[in-house]
């Protein structure tokens, strides 16, 4: 029987460095990478918030990565842009976004955008964060939008479970769904990568009436 050796922390670190170097949207020359039992920490500097997001996603794509600590700081060249400039542009971006309700608002402090208000669906909150994260001068986005509690369908547990099984990205049979009366969902079970873990959460968010998700899925390569 052939055995496949697990990646060491050194192997994992080198793989993440190569992945960061591979992407033209990331300047990896100022990003530090450390690995500790499958957990990756990114440090150093990036030039924009979208670059920071991209670096985090790239690290999580690497096989063997179980968790990520994103500690890079954004050193933007747009230092002349004030919080007022960013707030004005954020308001315009939210107004243009067709998937963002009028109840979502943006405030800015220290070039960090904080989104507040209410949305009916999780995808609307995600759309709001996506709409503002590329604004010049932004160094961070905090999504504090609350999802309105709705009537959870009696068969929502079965519906989510069926959707997980249908999804070709992972083995949905290994995921258990639990619900509570307040619209909360808990995911338990085993997946093969951080990407699968995230995808399972996205599938669950698609159910009506979901207000929160506790993702307890563990990763086994």
Ranges and model annotations:
Residues 1-221:
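N-terminal targeting leaders
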């Amino acid at each position: 029987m052939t055995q496949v050796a697990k990646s060491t922390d050194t192997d994992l670190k080198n793989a993440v460095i190569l992945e960061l170097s591979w992407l033209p949207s990331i300047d990896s020359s100022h990003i530090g990478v450390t690995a500790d039992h499958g957990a990756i920490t990114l440090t150093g500097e990036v030039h924009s918030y979208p670059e920071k997001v991209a670096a985090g996603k790239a690290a999580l794509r690497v096989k063997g990565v179980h968790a990520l600590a994103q500690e890079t700081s954004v050193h933007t060249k747009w230092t002349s842009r004030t919080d007022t400039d960013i707030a004005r542009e954020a308001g315009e971006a939210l107004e243009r976004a067709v998937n963002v309700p009028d109840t979502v608002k943006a405030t800015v402090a220290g070039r960090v955008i904080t989104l507040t208000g209410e949305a009916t669906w999780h995808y609307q909150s995600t759309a709001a964060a996506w709409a503002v994260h590329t604004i010049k001068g932004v160094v961070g986005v905090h999504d504090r939008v609350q999802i309105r509690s709705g009537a959870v369908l009696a068969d929502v547990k079965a519906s989510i479970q069926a959707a997980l099984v249908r999804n070709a990205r992972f083995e949905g049979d290994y995921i258990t769904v639990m619900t509570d009366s307040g619209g909360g969902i808990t995911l338990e079970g085993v997946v093969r990568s951080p990407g699968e873990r995230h995808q399972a959460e996205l599938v669950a968010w698609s159910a009506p009436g979901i207000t929160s998700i506790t993702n307890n899925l563990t990763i086994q390569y």
